[in-house]
Amino acid sequence: MTAEQASALLTVMTGFIEQEAGATRKVVAAITDLDYKPDPKSRTAGELAKHLVTADVWFADSIADGAFVWTGDSGTPPELTDPAAIATWHEKHLGDRLAKLRSMTSEQQLREVEFFGMKAPAVTWLGMMNNHAVHHRGQLAAYLRPMGSKVPAIYGMSADESLV
């Protein structure tokens, strides 16, 4: 990968992540029962929402810093007490991290970073970050109607929200 390709990938992926983050916050804000879980093996809606928003920040920090360091669940910020607070926290902290990612030098974008035994240039891990968020947002969106909430439009209108 050339420096120009890495820069283009960074621009495209941070744009995608920023766009997806808006949909993520809509899904989080739609939660009406943080304790809801569809199965005993599932996380609660609150646990899943908190994981989703804090993982976005962890991924971004790890990519920008050039190292994924997993020390287990380091705890949830205490201010993540309700859906609105979770969405607000995500907007603030992910916005800061996207700026940090966009300021990476070519050398930082291209440095090899290991993620659970896989090695790739730092900038390529933005795809994994985006996929992780989309995956967990999909899980959370599937919780909404069974908990009695409305499903927001994500990629197009839903049965509960029109785009026109």
Language-model regions, residue ranges each:
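Short coil/turn linker and secondary-structure boundary residues
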Residues: 1, 43, 78-81, 104, ...
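Active-site rim elements
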Residues: 7-14, 80-87, 130
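Short, contiguous alpha-helical
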Residues: 10, 14-25, 33-75, 114-164
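Hydrophobic alpha-helical core bundles mediating ligand binding, dimerization, or RNAP-core interactions
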Residues: 17, 21, 28, 90, ...
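Helix-adjacent hinge/juxtasegments
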Residues: 61-62, 66-104
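Acidic catalytic patch
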Residues: 101-116
